[in-house]
């Protein structure tokens, strides 16, 4: 049995399995969570967490109300990259369109709706103030007013400030301010609280990302799913921690954090609340029958009579672009989920991006990166192919040993090892070079799967989206053909059954890659093609050298 080929194809299978199995692995250790308790659902639909006030030794027991409502009084804010709707009832952002990212290749004029407040799908960014009425959290509901119903960032403006005005019954004058910046998906959200009353005001600032249960994108051997769910960062303890919707349903997260961030993730896109780096907050999750929430509630805020105070946070609504996320908050770029080999994937993406700036096409960038990787591993691959060539030359002698010893496996094994020693051939010589390359292959896979830059990126001819499957499945068929050619270059197994199994593998991998993103299949085709050329060259060169040496030896 050809052990080298078995190990090789097992390694290839592991690559495929890693793509759909390791995707769901939460590689950091999980934070302890508290048992589920009741939560407070306010009249506007906000969920308030269980909190422990400074003057209480026990957590507050919360009660849930049954109804939630929202107003239809919306204002629209449009920048060069965002189109958002703000509900004047409490000033929640209930719609967020990403203007530079079309919904689909077929509908380029319709922007991708990251946030939306539809009956079928609810995904909104809430922020509010609340107080404690005894031991019960009481949300401060504001019917804000706005000077205009439509705001637009002009081409000659770098910043747009939208101010909502509101008053509370207990003497608070509140201005809720949204600061939009040209070319940015980051929104500053600030509450300017003025205490016009005669008594000390004490309350809390609460931010949330709330979404209804999305359609699950499960992984299988023929499809690679993407992570959709919540996550957070607690500096010094958890750089990046996922919290799946199933985890939320089982128990509530309860984490004290300084700085950090909370987020809702999906393939390519992200929403995140980023508190000030020096602010202390409690991160929490809550789940109802329909909605899942991750939130951050501040430490108590006090405002003396006739004084004012500003509290706020930053909200990101946009694509998962590593360079952008790095500049917003530490570890936020880890939401570009490159898996356990993220450090290697980051290097490969930087190389791809550098090539893209020159060639201007992500497809050709994939091709050139594959060529560079192949060049980097040229010597290792050459060692592997030389081993294959040696094994091919030994096939007649190995077959003669099998015919000579028949069913005596012990003698066949002993004679085979003596033959390897005599001919100075290592049967496993081709395995190690291939195994060393596997982490690089897997890391590049993650880059091609996770990078939003490849979403709807065209290549050539009919390939107009490298992140989607080839609509005509031509690339998977070409990939299968390259695998078949590679097999023809390898030494043929002496066992007929093993030969049939090996012939079936190209069909298996063609099916495996049938619905894979075109960028992944393109990478594999280029890699296989380069491997075929290198193997053919080395095998031919090796075969030409050996007979010459044999003639010289005979002449002597």
From Swiss-Prot:
Membrane topology qualifier: Multi-pass membrane protein
GO cellular component: plasma membrane
BP term (GO), one: protein insertion into membrane
Name of one Pfam family that matches: 60KD_IMP
Residues annotated as transmembrane: 6-26, 332-352, 358-378, 428-448, 501-521
Major localisation: membrane
This protein's UniProt keywords: Cell inner membrane, Cell membrane, Chaperone, Membrane, Protein transport, Transmembrane, Transmembrane helix, Transport
GO molecular function terms attached to this record: membrane insertase activity
Compartments, as annotated in UniProt: Cell inner membrane
Subunit structure: Interacts with the Sec translocase complex via SecD. Specifically interacts with transmembrane segments of nascent integral membrane proteins during membrane integration.
Xref: NCBIfam families: PRK01318.1-3 (NF002352), yidC_nterm (TIGR03593), yidC_oxa1_cterm (TIGR03592)
Family, per entry: Belongs to the OXA1/ALB3/YidC family. Type 1 subfamily.
Role played: Required for the insertion and/or proper folding and/or complex formation of integral membrane proteins into the membrane. Involved in integration of membrane proteins that insert both dependently and independently of the Sec translocase complex, as well as at least some lipoproteins. Aids folding of multispanning membrane proteins.
Protein's name in the database: Membrane protein insertase YidC
Organism annotation: Legionella pneumophila (strain Paris)
């Amino acid at each position: 049995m050809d052990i080298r080929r078995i190990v090789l194809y097992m390694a290839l299978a592991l690559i495929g399995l890693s793509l759909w199995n390791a995707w769901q692995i939460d590689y950091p250790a999980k934070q302890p969570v508290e048992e589920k308790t009741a939560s407070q659902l306010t009249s506007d639909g906000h969920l308030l967490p269980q909190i422990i006030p400074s003057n209480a030794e026990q957590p507050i027991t919360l009660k849930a109300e049954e109804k939630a409502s929202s107003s239809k009084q919306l204002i629209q804010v449009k920048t060069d990259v965002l189109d958002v709707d703000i509900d004047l009832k409490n000033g929640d952002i209930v719609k967020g369109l990403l203007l530079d990212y079309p919904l689909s290749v077929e509908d380029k004029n319709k922007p991708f709706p990251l946030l939306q407040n539809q009956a079928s799908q609810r995904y909104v960014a809430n922020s509010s103030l609340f107080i404690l009425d005894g031991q019960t959290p009481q949300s401060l509901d504001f019917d804000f007013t706005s000077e205009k119903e439509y705001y637009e960032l002009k081409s000659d403006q770098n910043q747009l400030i939208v101010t909502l005005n509101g008053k509370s019954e207990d003497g608070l004058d509140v201005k809720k301010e949204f600061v939009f910046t040209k070319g940015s998906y980051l929104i500053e959200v600030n509450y300017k609280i003025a205490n016009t009353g005669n008594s000390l005001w004490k309350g809390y600032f609460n931010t949330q990302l709330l979404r209804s249960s999305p359609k699950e994108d499960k992984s299988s051997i023929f499809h690679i799913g993407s992570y959709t769910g919540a996550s957070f960062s607690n500096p010094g303890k958890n750089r990046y921690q996922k919290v799946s919707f199933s985890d939320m349903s089982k128990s509530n997260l309860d984490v004290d954090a300084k700085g950090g961030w909370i987020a809702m993730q999906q393939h390519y896109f992200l929403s995140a609340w980023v508190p000030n780096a020096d602010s202390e907050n409690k991160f929490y999750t809550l789940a109802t029958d329909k909605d899942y929430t991750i939130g951050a509630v501040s430490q108590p805020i006090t405002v003396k009579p006739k004084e004012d105070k500003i509290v706020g946070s930053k909200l990101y609504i946009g694509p998962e672009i590593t360079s952008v996320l790095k500049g917003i908050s530490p570890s936020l770029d880890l939401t570009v989920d490159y898996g356990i080999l993220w450090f290697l994937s980051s290097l490969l993406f930087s190389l791809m991006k550098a090539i893209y700036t020159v060639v201007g096409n992500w497809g050709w960038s994939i091709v050139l990166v594959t060529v560079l990787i192949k060049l980097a591993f040229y010597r290792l691959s050459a060692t592997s192919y030389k081993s294959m060539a040696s094994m091919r030359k030994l096939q007649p002698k190995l077959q003669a040993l099998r015919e000579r010893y028949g069913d005596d496996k012990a003698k066949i094994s002993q004679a085979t090892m003596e033959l390897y020693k005599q001919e100075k051939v290592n049967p496993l010589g081709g395995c190690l070079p291939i195994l060393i390359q596997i982490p690089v292959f897997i890391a590049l896979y993650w880059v091609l799967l996770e990078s939003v830059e490849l979403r709807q990126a065209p290549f050539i001819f009919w390939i107009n989206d490298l992140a989607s499957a080839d609509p005509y499945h031509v690339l998977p068929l070409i990939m299968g053909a390259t695998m078949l050619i590679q097999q023809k270059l390898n030494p043929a197994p002496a066992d007929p059954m093993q030969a049939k199994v090996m012939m079936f593998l190209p069909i298996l991998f063609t099916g495996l890659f049938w619905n894979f993103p075109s960028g992944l299949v393109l990478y594999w085709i280029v890699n296989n093609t380069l491997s075929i050329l290198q193997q053919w060259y080395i095998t031919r060169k090796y075969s030409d050298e050996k007979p010459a040496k044999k003639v010289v030896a005979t002449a002597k």
